Every structure is written in C-alpha cells, then in structure tokens.
C-alpha cells in the first residue's frame, strides 16, 4: 500500500526507521511521557538518531589518529605495541565483563540512559591526552566498562524495526561508522600538522560534547514501557551481571553459540589489524601521513558502498548465513594479501577487499538479533559486543606479540622501507600477524558453515504469541517470518533506493 504521509523529497530507506513501516504500538507517545520528558527527544526513534550518535563518537576518535600514534610512541618508546596491547587488553576485558549487564539493564530501564552513559565514559579520556598521557591511557583502560555503544545502538534499532528490516538498518549504522573515518583522520592530520595536537584534542572534545548533548536533547527513547520486564525501581539479579552466566545461556542454544564462536574467531584478527596496521603501513610499506589518510578514506568510502548497496542485495539473493560466509571469505583474502604483500599497490588492492569484508558485522548482528526475543535484544547484542570487547583486548596483544617474535618492534614513527636493518626486507612473509589472522578467519568460516540458515520455529511462535512480540513482528506476518531469511522481501531494496516519485511500501 502507498505511504501518503511520506514526503517525496525524503529518501526511501527512511521507511525502515519510520514507525509507519513498523508495527509500533500506538501508545508509544504516552509511554515516553510517563518515563519523563527528557526521554522524549525529537520525533520517533529512527535510524537517523542511531547513525548520528555513532558518527559523532567515532568522528571524535578518528580525529585523534595521528596524535594517538605520537603520544603512544612518546609515552612507551620501548615495545610500543606490546604496551598498546596491554592497554587495549584491559579495556577489552572490562568491556567483556560489563557488556551483558549493560545490555540487560537497557532491556529494563530503556536505551537512552545507557546511550548517554556509554558515549560519555568512552569519550571521557579524550581531553586527558594533552593533560596527562599516563592518566589518558589509564582512563582508556577503565573506559572499557562502558565501551559498548554498538550493542546499545543495535538494541535501540531492533526496538522499532521488523526482523526483515534489521540488516538494512544495521548496515546503515555500520556504514555511518565507516563514514566517520573517511574524513576525520584527514582533518585531524591537517590540524595537527598546521596547528598542533592540542587543537585536535580540543576539536575532538567538542565533538564528543556535541554527541552527548544530542543524545540528551534529541534522541527519543525506543523501548516501550509495555515491553520492559521491570520498572525503574526493580532490582536486577546478579546473574544478569555475570558475563560468564550469559555465556552459559549462549551454550544452551547451539545456533547462538556457533554465531558467538564465529564472531570471536573473525573479530580477533580484525581487532589486532586495526591496532597495528597504520604503523605497519608507515614503517614497513613506507606510507607517509598523507597516503595513510587517503588509504583510510578509500576503505571507508568503499565500506559505505558495501554496507548499503551490496549488503541489501546480498541479503536478498544469498540469505543471512551465506552473506556472513561471503564476508568472512573477503576477510581471509585481504588478510592473506596483507601478509604476503610487500608493495604499496598491493596494500591499495587489498584495501578494496577489506572494504567488502565489512559486510560481516551487520549481517552477524542481524542474525543474532533474529534469534533473540524482542525483550532480550539488549542482552543478545551485549553478549556479542562483549565478545568483540574481549577480542579488542586479545587481538592487539596477539599481533604485538607476533611482531615481537619476528623481531619487528614498530616502535619508530618514521618509515623504514628499504632500510638495511629492516628484518622484513626480503622476507617471504612480510606481515606474519596478518597471515596468522587469515588462518584464524578460516576457522571462523568453517564454524559458520554449521550455523542454521533459518530461525527456530518454536522461538518465533512464542515470540508472536507474547504481548511484547507486537513491537517488532506483525501478527499477520508471524508465520511467514519463520521460513524467510532476513531481507528476502524485495520491497526492502525498493524502500532504500527507488526513485522518490515512485514510493510504494509493501507491508
């Protein structure tokens, strides 16, 4: 049926986030009013709200790409990447321990308070970079307790989208993350070169404050009062605070267990790659600051295309599971290419493959969301984010240790290409950690082969028969969702990119 209320000038994919394209309870407005005016925000919850929050947070950190390398090297001149791995390891461990609790609390108390808390504490260390580097790195480690913005954001999006819409919505959110990295490192590098690192830190701090103000003023609460299992005054069981108890629950569901193992084995090398790759490009391959910024921008732009244009098409044509497998295949290829590559053009070519591998995370997030009830989205995404947080700690330490074992310290900021004392000159494997990472992703690929393509019927029927199920799954489509992969309905692609004058939404 046609959506007469939507402006022709508005893009079609807004219907994914609009309550007109979802089965939103009519009493959402009154529920928000009952929760307090500060929860209301502007308009209805939408992908726009989630994407803007993610964009500002990672834009602020993207500005610090160049200053971060400088401060890290100056603070830890010896064994730089081993120390970086230790710092990130503490942060990742704390994220792993806290993510399930924050997800469970957001299922009870709503998403907005925890969006505000996660962004505030994640960005809190930024101004300390120029005040006291030791406090800065110490606070980065401690901030891992709240570094779970993605899990809250994905639970936020799941509250107002139908199952077959979520991977598209998740793709847009993930693409926004990539978009924030397209320009922010270049801007940060320019400001650092011309005005000094202090101005970069100041700008990043202001962007973080803008993000906090946006959440406080503009972001509406997405979780209806009717779906919350408890009230603000209810106590939370300590079992919900135990991440290992959450993992035990995961072990009871073979599908979720396989997904979590896939996430761990795929994100472990990815986290290590993110922590060391830019210095690797600079020191071993010989990239200067301008080339590194251009490389980040290229991969970011291609990632946006992959997560918006290609992800939707792949989900419709291949299904959820096969899209995950394809993303893992791209990840294996790009890591192997980085491992064997020794020329600059090889890095650029592998970067295009790396951009295509970015479809894995939104596809996996949609898969885990599909296997969770509507009142357990925060817990489900929290478990996945906790595993990713653990990888954020183990990955950098693993890569730093492998570089150390191969006598590559990467502790200097200047490029060492063609240097006589470079141990990698003439080496058969210039990047050992990346090749090792490709082997780990191969294991992830083999595990993902055993993930069932479709959701369990019993779980969906229970979901449809519950009162909370009406938030995300319309009763008239309940039986159809049991046998459809995400985004199998071709109308979702039409929602995203059909000409504005020919808008038609099929419900």
Swiss-Prot record:
SUPFAM superfamilies, per the entry: MFS general substrate transporter
Glycosylation sites recorded in the entry for this protein: 464-465
Ranges per topology, Cytoplasmic: 73-84, 135-136, 192-198, 279-283, 345-347, 411-430
Any single Pfam family the record assigns to this protein: MFS_1
Disulfide-bond pairs as recorded: none
Biased composition (Polar residues): 459-473
Residue numbers on the Extracellular membrane side: 1-51, 106-113, 158-170, 220-257, 305-323, 369-389, 452-507
The keyword GTP-binding is assigned to this record: no
Family membership: Belongs to the major facilitator superfamily.
Sequence segments annotated as region (Disordered): 1-27, 459-483
Membrane topology: Multi-pass membrane protein
Protein's cellular compartments: Membrane
Keyword Glycoprotein assigned: yes
Gene Ontology MF terms in the entry: transmembrane transporter activity
Transmembrane segments: 52-72, 85-105, 114-134, 137-157, 171-191, 199-219, 258-278, 284-304, 324-344, 348-368, 390-410, 431-451
CDD domains: MFS_MFSD14 (cd17387)
Organism of origin: Mus musculus (Mouse)
Protein name: Hippocampus abundant transcript-like protein 1
Major localization class: membrane
UniProt KW keywords: Glycoprotein, Membrane, Transmembrane, Transmembrane helix, Transport
GO CC annotations, alphabetized: membrane
Superkingdom of origin: Eukaryota
């Amino acid at each position: 049926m046609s959506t007469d209320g939507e402006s022709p000038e508005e893009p079609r994919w807004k219907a994914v986030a609009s309550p007109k394209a979802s089965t939103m309870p009519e009493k959402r407005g009154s529920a928000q009013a009952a929760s307090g005016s500060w929860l209301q925000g502007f308009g209805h919850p939408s992908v726009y709200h989630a994407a803007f929050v993610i964009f500002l947070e990672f834009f602020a950190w993207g500005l610090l790409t160049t200053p971060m390398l400088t401060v890290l090297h100056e603070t830890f001149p010896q064994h730089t990447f081993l120390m970086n791995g230790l710092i990130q390891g503490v942060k990742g461990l704390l994220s792993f321990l806290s993510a399930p609790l924050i997800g469970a609390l957001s299922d009870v108390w709503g998403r907005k308070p925890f969006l505000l808390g996660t962004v505030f504490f994640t960005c809190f260390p930024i101004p300390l970079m120029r005040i006291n580097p030791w406090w800065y790195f110490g606070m980065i480690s401690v901030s891992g307790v709240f570094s779970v913005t993605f899990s809250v954001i994905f639970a936020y999006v799941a509250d107002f989208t139908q199952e077959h819409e979520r991977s598209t919505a998740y793709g847009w959110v993930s693409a926004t993350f990539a978009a924030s990295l397209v320009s922010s490192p270049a801007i940060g590098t320019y400001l650092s070169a011309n005005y000094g690192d202090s101005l970069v830190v100041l700008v990043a701090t202001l962007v973080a404050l803008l993000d906090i103000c946006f959440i406080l003023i503009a972001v509406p609460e997405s979780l209806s009062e009717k779906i919350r299992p408890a009230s603000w005054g209810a106590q939370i069981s300590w079992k919900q605070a135990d991440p290992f108890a959450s993992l035990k629950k995961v072990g009871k569901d073979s599908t979720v267990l396989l997904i979590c193992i896939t996430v761990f084995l795929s994100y472990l090398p990815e986290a290590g790659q993110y922590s060391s790759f830019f210095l690797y490009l600079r020191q071993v391959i010989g990239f200067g600051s301008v080339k590194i910024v251009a490389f980040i921008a290229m991969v970011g732009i291609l990632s946006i295309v992959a997560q918006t244009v290609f992800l939707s098409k792949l989900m419709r044509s291949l299904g959820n599971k096969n899209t995950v497998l394809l993303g893992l295949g791209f990840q294996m290829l790009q890591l192997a290419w980085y491992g064997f590559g020794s020329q600059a053009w090889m890095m650029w070519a592998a970067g295009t493959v790396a951009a295509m591998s970015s479809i894995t995370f939104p596809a996996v997030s949609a898969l885990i969301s599909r296997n969770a009830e509507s009142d357990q989205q925060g817990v489900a995404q929290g478990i996945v984010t906790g595993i990713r947080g653990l990888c954020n700690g183990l990955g950098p330490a693993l890569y730093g240790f492998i570089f150390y074992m191969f006598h590559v310290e990467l502790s200097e900021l200047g490029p060492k290409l063609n240097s006589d004392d470079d141990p990698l000159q003439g080496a058969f494997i210039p990047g050992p950690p990346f090749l090792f990472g490709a082997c780990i992703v191969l294991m992830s690929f083999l595990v993902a082969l055993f993930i069932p393509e479709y959701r369990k019927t019993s779980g969906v029927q229970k979901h449809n028969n519950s009162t909370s199920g009406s938030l995300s799954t319309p009763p008239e489509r309940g039986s159809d969702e049991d046998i459809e992969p995400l985004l199998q309905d071709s109308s979702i692609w039409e929602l995203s990119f059909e000409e504005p004058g020919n808008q038609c939404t099929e419900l």
